[in-house]
Amino acid sequence: MQKRITIFDTVRGFTMLSMAGFHACYDLAYLYGWNMPWFTGTIFQDIWRASISWVFLFIAGWMCTLSRNNVKRAAKYAAAALIVWIATTLVSVDDSVNFGIIYCMAACTAVVALTRSLLQKIPSSWGIATCLVLFALTWGIPKAVYPLPYLAWLGFPGPGFVSGDYYPLIPFVFMYLTGFFTACAAQIANFETP
């Protein structure tokens, strides 16, 4: 059995608790009509949401460097995303989850699985810097509506597209790859330390 990396398990655990708290507040405010202006009327909700999803994506990107089989990992994420989509479509309490965070992790893991040999040729510091810049530059892309059908998965939602949790490949692949390149940098630093 592989040794666990405690810091990642700890951060993931706290992030899972934060996610549970976020979803509880979301449900209370939007499904049950509780008056929560600190959650619904400020930027706090966006910051809280980002603190959860960005941590998950960064850590998942890091874990790609430790995985023996990223294709299998991507397939597991994709199966979980499909189950979430089916469940949220059938229950219809809120908008169904189309291209949510688990889908995003599946797609990003598949990207790394397919391009890892190329990614490993990029100096880690350049990869980190480039991905953070691209993340910032492409942040607004999925916030617009495009006259292109069937590209919401990539980050170009068309008219009529709705999702209860939307994390398309663009821009979030760049946060995922930031985790990947940071792991590569840490592994090189660890290897070079006497």
Model-derived features with residue positions:
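Alpha-helical transmembrane segments and their immediate juxtamembrane cytosolic regions
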Residues: 1-194
